Structure formats: C-alpha cells, structure tokens
C-alpha cells in the first residue's frame, strides 16, 4: 500500500486544472486531471484515486452530478468541491448529500496542501489508498 495520495482534479478550465496538478505534483501527490465529468469517470475506471477535487459549475455533468455517479461506483472516495459560488444551490445540495469539504476559488494553495495531507492519515487508517 502506497502512502502517496492519488488525486483527480476535475475542472472545465484547463489552466486551473493544469496549475493545480503542477503544484500538487511538486508537493508529492500523484495527480490526474480531467476537463469534464465524463472524462473523470473514464479516468477513475483506469486509475483509482483517493480524492476527487472537482469544480461544481461545469458544462455537461456538473460537480454534484459527478459526485453522485462516483458515490455509486466508489462509495468511500473522498470528494472536495471547489467553487466561486459558495452560496450556490448545487453546493448546498452536495453538502446535504455528504460532501464534507467546500473550497472557495481562488484556492489558497497552502491550505489545500495542508488539507490534502491531513486526509493521508484518514485514508491510511481506513485502508483505502488507491491501488497502485
């Protein structure tokens, strides 16, 4: 079992996804990026991850719909919403359905790295690090 956290970033803005991926990789995380919910589901089939970090407002499948789909397939996957619209109804619904962490954009990268690192113990204790 690896102690490296595997993260899937989903954002329809490639600049945001790529920047996040670059920063998190430098910090020691394994990162995949997707530009849509559909692409994220495909990546998850091929490369299991520990944490899903997804934008909420995206064309096609939004972050809440992606959360619902991933929860069916991977019920223990940790999901973090990131949004510029923290009062949005999708955010409120996500929280009601079990999303525990909502991050406002623009993201505080130091806080994000600390948060993701804090999940390392939770993931390891649950014995659910993604398969290598």
What spans do the regions from the language model cover?
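Active-site beta3 strand of CheY-like receiver
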Residues: 47-53
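Short amphipathic alpha-helix used as the core "switch/output" element in two-component signaling
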Residues: 42, 64-76
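C-terminal output helix
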Residues: 89, 107-117
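Short hydrophobic/Thr-rich beta-strand motif most characteristic of the beta2 strand and flanking loop
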Residues: 28-35, 43
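Acidic catalytic/metal-coordinating carboxylates
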Residues: 35-39, 62-65
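Charged docking surfaces used in two-component/phosphorelay signaling
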Residues: 18-26
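Receiver (REC) domain active-site loop signature in two-component systems and cognate sites
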Residues: 58
């Amino acid at each position: 079992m690896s102690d490296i956290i595997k993260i899937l970033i989903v954002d329809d803005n490639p600049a945001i996804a790529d920047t996040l991926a670059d920063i998190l990789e430098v910090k020691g995380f394994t990162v995949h990026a997707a530009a849509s919910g559909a692409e994220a589901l495909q990546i998850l089939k091929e490369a299991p991850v520990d944490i899903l970090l997804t934008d909420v407002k995206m064309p096609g499948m939004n972050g809440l719909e992606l959360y619902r789909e991933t929860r069916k397939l991977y019920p223990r996957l940790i999901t973090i919403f990131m949004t510029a619209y923290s009062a949005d109804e999708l955010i409120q619904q996500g929280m009601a359905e079990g999303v525990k962490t909502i991050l406002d954009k623009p993201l505080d990268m130091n806080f994000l790295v600390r948060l993701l690192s804090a999940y390392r113990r939770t993931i390891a204790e649950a014995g659910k690090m993604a398969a290598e």
